[in-house]
Amino acid sequence: MAMDFIRIRGARTHNLKNIDLDLPRDKLIVITGLSGSGKSSLAFDTIYAEGQRRYVESLSAYARQFLSVMEKPDLDHIEGLSPAISIEQKSTSHNPRSTVGTITEIYDYLRLLYARVGQPRCPDHGFPLEAQTVSQMVDHMLAQDQEQRYMLLAPVIRDRKGEHAQVFEQLRAQGFVRVRVDGELYEIDAVPPLALRQKHTIEAVIDRFRPREDIKQRLAESFETALKLGEGMVAVQSLDDPAAAPHLFSSKYSCPVCDYSLPELEPRLFSFNAPVGACPSCDGLGVAEFFDPDRVVVHPELSLSAGAVRGWDRRNAYYFQLIASLAKHYKFDVDAVWNTLPAKVRQAVLFGSGDEVISFTYFTDAGGRTTRKHRFEGILPNLERRYRETESPAVREELTKYVSQQPCPACNGTRLNRAARNVFVADRPLPELVVLPVNEALSFFRGLSLPGWRGEIAAKIVKEIGERLGFLVDVGLDYLTLERKADTLSGGEAQRIRLASQIGAGLVGVMYVLDEPSIGLHQRDNERLLGTLTRLRDLGNTVIVVEHDEDAIRLADHVLDIGPGAGVHGGEICAQGTLDDILKSPRSLTGQYLSGKRRIEIPKQRHKPNPKMMLHLRGATGNNLKNVDLDIPAGLLTCITGVSGSGKSTLINDTLFTLAANEINGASHTVAPHREVENLDLFDKVVDIDQSPIGRTPRSNPATYTGMFTPLRELFAQVPEARARGYSPGRFSFNVRGGRCEACQGDGMIKVEMHFLPDVYVPCDVCHGKRYNRETLEIRYKGFNISDVLQMTVEDALRLFEPVPSIARKLETLVDVGLSYIKLGQSATTLSGGEAQRVKLSKELSRRDTGRTLYILDEPTTGLHFHDIEALLGVLHKLRDEGNTVVVIEHNLDVIKTADWIVDLGPEGGHRGGTILVSGTPEEVAAHKASYTGQFLAKMLPSVKARETRPAAMANKPDARPPRKVKPEKVAKAAKSATKKTAKKAS
């Protein structure tokens, strides 16, 4: 009997509190709730983990040892599961060979298409390389004018130097009486001596004929003789019209002019991961590394003696004596600014003197001088040589700082070799197709019509390609190109690519578990994504989505709201059922926001920008940006909006952040191309807060990441008992010998390998999971040892450490960003993306800032519930009110409507985007008809504009630097009391 429900009893994974529930099968189920409430614990660590585990356990023990078997979730009973597929937000691959085309398998079909119906051409002459049979050659010639006379030629020698007397002897011996030498006809006995040092072409005249039906047999035999003599090549020249182009034939894939040939086409030839198809220069990576003059000349505003090129200034005696000798030879001043030196001098310094010999003066250790004459190697060739010859990893790492990447000059970044680049389908080579945006590629294949047998073969392949491209368009990725590297995709894009691949697979009866597929997607594209999810469901699958998007929740067949709080305060089912059930439930926070009982308010007044305090970025042209001029008001909260692929990340992350980090923080990022930047001196620090994990090992935790663990260990080292025993702060670290338990090396758990079963982690039987040895655990602060403290939640720890400012400040900021429920020693690998980002935000908040920091956040609302977003906005507005500048890339309309300033990019994604449509207040953007963001924003803003009376926190003194307004301790206390007030209101 078919089951209609997935029945779960007694689920206790992570923070789930023994929950029982029945989920309908073959429906679209949305699981929502606060960040950290237990949504992923239920969807991924319970339902998916058990579905996957059961499927894998049905395989043989031999097969299981090659698969990663998931840990058995902590629950009493579960039934009604299907084989499970999870589509998570993790980025696809860090392999530089992985592209959108290879992930979606579209590239495999393209390789097949080009191998089966592609037409190879000669790279130099453009002639089609078509192998013809003798019958085809004869038929072609018999179709010519019967009154014309022709001669059949077999090329024996092609463009080779020499007298070739031996060749003529051999032809004479074989019975040939006429030859054509360099275009002139001769009797074989009357050929003049050939010039030894000149190139010659010698063709044997095989036959002379008029094309008539009765000579078909003779002509076939002549062609066979000619092909044998000419090694598969034949030319037929008109005798009556010598100026006419010859008819060229080949029995193999080769050019009739230059003998360029190809073996039979096969899919491997078009793979940049196979030696037969990859460009030999870059091994199929498409990029070449080179020492970049812009990176080598670090400070072009300085002179060579003052350090324009690091390591070649006065501080390095050996290299500077070379520069001094160069200056004497080329008559320039070593103290002159690099930018003012003549181009010829700069060329010689960087690339060497070429053939020019220069007199160099060397100082010996004894104080003497020697003079030697030789060519100057050049700084860049010097770096290349040292990089090539060194065996020291440290030297190699140091030199890597000066290396940049550029498209491979041999293949122009296409990754393929010469042969693969010159095979055509409908007059288009493969590299030309993979650079098209997906929607244009789809149009090309829909309109593709090949004649004859090629069309029949191509039909099936083209259908598969078209379907897969269509799925990418459906999930809002029409702006991507197939050659886009996988490691440049955002988490949301990577997830939607996997989603498109799954729809392409067309499986039925499967359970899909998705993690926020709407991330990085503009409201405009949301409808198409939701259509894709319903399509997956309609195929006959159960689709379980962890999602906060309002449209997705409203569309779902079944909604599950987990809460009421986060962490230890969550793990319960607050409400479940249809949308109406959620709206009516008094316990459901989600229902309160959806019904309008609670909402994120629009500010009563907006902060005005100060025209004298604007950051100007001019002429940004990275990726798809079209000479963009960006103005960001200092001291305000600015939202960067626009449809997916419009250029937001390129403009902010690749251009603005890298530029500011290099200038202000002294970093060495590669900056996307731009013309100039003004007013960066408004800021003294730039901070990028993204959603990457705060640590990749289980030893990393919120206490270590925020820097709280150091004062914590110092505090324990000051306890009288610890001082009496002579314990240092290092004694209380679980990462070094001394205080940690050596049986488990401070992990608290011991891994037991089970081969084809999942590895089992058991608590260490020496320390019982406490990570420290007995002596260390005897040291107590107010009755708690170091292990007890790491097991505390942030709110409990704050009560304990309130009198210790260095620890309390860090704990207060964790509370401010809504992370009061996480444990201090919780493994970083168990934090969600939203939690990791807020831990980073809290770390920055806990630092004493000057009110002149530029904060850049990329989609901070990822993984956040409406209620979490409200708390996050409180933090961002607090940063802004202290005089800092906050720039947020965001699609969430609740964040956008509360911003002071919006920069909207578009109008579309990919090559149809890359321009700023409108900049201004939310009201100004909402009034802009061409802006998609404006259209959705207009529905959320009241018709009465917010009163724009209050000036920005730093606009009072236009000529002064942004002032520091509030001390962090006061801010933290104010925020804490505000949090308590909201908590009282909520209850």
UniProtKB/Swiss-Prot annotation:
Location in the cell: Cytoplasm
Residues the record lists as binding ATP: 33-40, 642-649
Ranges of biased composition (kind: Basic and acidic residues): 958-972
HAMAP family assigned to the protein according to its UniProt record, in alphabetical order: UvrA
Species, as recorded: Xanthomonas axonopodis pv. citri (strain 306)
Keywords: ATP-binding, Cytoplasm, DNA damage, DNA excision, DNA repair, DNA-binding, Excision nuclease, Metal-binding, Nucleotide-binding, Repeat, SOS response, Zinc, Zinc-finger
A single cellular component GO annotation: cytoplasm
GO annotation, biological process: nucleotide-excision repair; SOS response
Ranges where the record places region Disordered: 948-987
ABC transporter domain mapped to chain residues: 312-589, 609-938
Name of the protein described by the UniProt record: UvrABC system protein A
PROSITE patterns in UniProt: ABC_TRANSPORTER_1, ABC_TRANSPORTER_2
Subunit structure and binding partners: Forms a heterotetramer with UvrB during the search for lesions.
Basic residues: bias regions: 978-987
Record-stated family: Belongs to the ABC transporter superfamily. UvrA family.
GO terms for MF: ATP binding; ATP hydrolysis activity; DNA binding; excinuclease ABC activity; zinc ion binding
Zinc finger (C4-type): 255-282, 741-767
UniProt main location, coarse: cytoplasm
Originating gene: uvrA
Known function: The UvrABC repair system catalyzes the recognition and processing of DNA lesions. UvrA is an ATPase and a DNA-binding protein. A damage recognition complex composed of 2 UvrA and 2 UvrB subunits scans DNA for abnormalities. When the presence of a lesion has been verified by UvrB, the UvrA molecules dissociate.
